[in-house]
């Protein structure tokens, strides 16, 4: 065990000679001077007590006591550990090794072509990091050559044929070549490919992505694309068939006067619907009349396919929340329409049509009667009748 020097021992003796310090270690010295041979036996109410004869020593006798060397030995251990701890804290950290700079000399000839160099200036930090990552990539070609494009360039068919024959799977290559030979005349002799259609003759001859991996037929994809285009063309035709403006003769003075009697008389005539729709356009609510008219046209259809297509068009134009011409419907009616869209019928929008009809009757019809559109029309017809 390491021992303290003579100077440190003298300092500790002076320090512990104080009364306040002596009282802290007083039980230790009393225990050392405990005399077990001297006991005074007293009998007090039947209990035996051993009263030791403890001699207390003044602070001046601390250096002469036999417990002082043991105390010094106990204190030397924590003091030495504290000294080692503080010396470790005050010790300087070892110098760091200098960082190795990346060598971009193989890539410097390619920098002017890529417009990345500025004379002899130092490369930016971000660019150096990118170049370092490029150098760390496995399989990089030596000499700074440019990397190959990610997508392979299509090779001529002769090279593909030779590559397929020289591949380790000759059966797969031969089957692929046979499939291509069969597809080329089949695509050229397809009756559905009219000469007037752009790209119809070359669509089957060009190999698609599936032919390279699955060896499927391109003719089936061509037929599928043509079938997918048919509903689109039909939907455009059906969308054009939906009424946007009704042809009607000029209304008479009696008809215009009858519009003021009830909303039903206004909606029953084409001239009344056109006049009312012109008013709704000024209030930015023309979609209500368009939706009502589209539902009336849907009720006249009998073909199931046309009904399904027209129902889908009406849903996309007026029911969908993504449509700019969405009509105002409550949640119950929307839920019913969404459930019935699986198998739509002629009357799928009856509840929605009635709700929009009621909305126009209560909200828009009174304002139409007081609008300038109706008053000007009524005044012009009245003047014509007077002149006649």
From Swiss-Prot:
Localization per record: Membrane; Nucleus; Cytoplasm
SMART domains on file: RGS
Low complexity bias: start-end ranges: 185-197
Superkingdom, natural source: Eukaryota
Keyword field contains Iron-sulfur: no
Cellular component, GO annotation: cytoplasm; nucleus; plasma membrane; trans-Golgi network
Post-translational modification (record): Fatty acylated. Heavily palmitoylated in the cysteine string motif.
SUPFAM superfamilies: Regulator of G-protein signaling, RGS (SSF48097)
Annotated InterPro entries: RGS, RGS_sf, RGS_subdomain_2
Function: Inhibits signal transduction by increasing the GTPase activity of G protein alpha subunits thereby driving them into their inactive GDP-bound form. Binds selectively to G(z)-alpha and G(alpha)-i2 subunits, accelerates their GTPase activity and regulates their signaling activities. The G(z)-alpha activity is inhibited by the phosphorylation and palmitoylation of the G-protein. Negatively regulates mu-opioid receptor-mediated activation of the G-proteins.
Name of the protein described by the UniProt record: Regulator of G-protein signaling 20
Subunit structure: Forms a complex with G(alpha)z/i2 subunits and mu-opioid receptors; the formation of this complex results in mu-opioid receptor desensitization. Interacts with OPRM1.
Annotated membrane topology: Lipid-anchor
Gene3D superfamilies xref list: Regulator of G-protein Signalling 4, domain 2
Protein keywords: Cytoplasm, Glycoprotein, Lipoprotein, Membrane, Nucleus, Palmitate, Phosphoprotein, Signal transduction inhibitor, Ubl conjugation
Protein's gene: RGS20
């Amino acid at each position: 065990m390491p021992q303290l020097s003579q100077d440190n021992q003298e300092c500790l003796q002076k320090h512990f000679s104080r009364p306040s310090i002596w009282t802290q270690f007083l039980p230790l010295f009393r225990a050392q001077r405990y005399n077990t041979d001297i006991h005074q036996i007293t009998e007090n109410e039947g209990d035996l007590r051993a009263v030791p004869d403890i001699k207390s020593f003044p602070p001046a006798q601390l250096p002469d006591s036999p417990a002082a060397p043991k105390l010094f030995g106990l204190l030397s251990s924590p003091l030495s550990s504290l000294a080692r701890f503080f010396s470790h804290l005050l010790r300087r950290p070892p110098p760091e090794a200098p960082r190795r700079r990346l060598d971009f000399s193989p890539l410097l000839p390619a920098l002017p072509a890529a417009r990345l160099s500025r004379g002899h200036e130092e490369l930016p930090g971000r660019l150096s990091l990118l170049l370092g990552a490029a150098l760390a990539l496995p399989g990089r070609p030596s000499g700074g050559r440019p990397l190959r494009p990610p997508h392979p360039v299509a090779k001529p068919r002769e090279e593909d044929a030779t590559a397929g024959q020289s591949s380790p799977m000759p059966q797969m290559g031969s089957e692929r070549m046979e499939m291509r030979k069969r597809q080329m005349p089949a695509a050229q002799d397809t009756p559905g490919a009219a000469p007037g259609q752009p790209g119809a003759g070359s669509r089957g001859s060009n190999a698609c992505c599936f032919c390279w991996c699955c060896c499927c037929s391109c003719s089936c994809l061509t037929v599928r694309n043509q079938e997918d285009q048919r509903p689109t063309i039909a939907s455009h035709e059906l969308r054009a068939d939906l009424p946007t403006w009704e042809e009607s003769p000029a209304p008479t003075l009696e008809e215009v006067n009858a519009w003021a009697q009830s909303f039903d008389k206004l909606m029953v005539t084409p001239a009344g619907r056109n006049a009312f729709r012109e008013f709704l356009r000024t209030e930015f609510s023309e979609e209500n009349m368009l939706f009502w008219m589209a539902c009336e046209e849907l009720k006249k259809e009998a073909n199931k396919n046309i009904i399904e297509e027209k129902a889908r068009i009406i849903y996309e134009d007026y029911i969908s929340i993504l449509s700019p011409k969405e009509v105002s419907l409550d949640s119950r009616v929307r839920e019913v329409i969404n459930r019935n869209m699986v198998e739509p019928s002629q009357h799928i929008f009856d509840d929605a049509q009635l709700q929009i009809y009621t909305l126009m009757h209560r909200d828009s019809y009174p304002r139409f009667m007081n609008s300038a559109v109706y008053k000007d029309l009524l005044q012009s017809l009245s003047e014509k009748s007077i002149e006649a």
